Amino acid sequence: MFESSETEEIANQVNLSSLYEIAKNSAQIGNEILKINYNKIQKISSKGRKGDLVTNVDLEVENKIKEYLLEETPNISINAEESGTLNKSSDLTWCIDPLDGTTNYSHGYPFFGTSIGLVYKNNPIIGAISVPYLNELYSACIGL
């Protein structure tokens, strides 16, 4: 957890409110794609471990969010669940789970969403989770 001086250090280096909006927008991008593709036939494959699935929708959401983040924050690293890390040698890293609940989604169960986080030196500072079924967006930002 951050001390107040560390929170001030982060706030002095980045525009937290702007990054917070970008995180929420990213989660909403995922939300819209998940809604459009829900209950449609999709390509499903295994990522290795039994029950660890990936669908074409996971990949589509991840790609759209990465495009958006690279456009809005080109100097921030990205760690995406399906494609790995795009390292920019930054203290900041976006973490993307494009379809949190792939098994539920692929079986037609409505409990899934998109999760986005921003970490600073391996400490979480921003998080946003969209849940299409509930039409909700949950989010938090350190210091705001």
Can you annotate each of these PLM segments?
Residues 88-143:
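DPxDG-like acidic metal-binding loop motif
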Residues 1-99:
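N-terminal subdomain of lithium-sensitive/metallo-dependent phosphomonoesterases centered on the IMPase/IPPase/PAP
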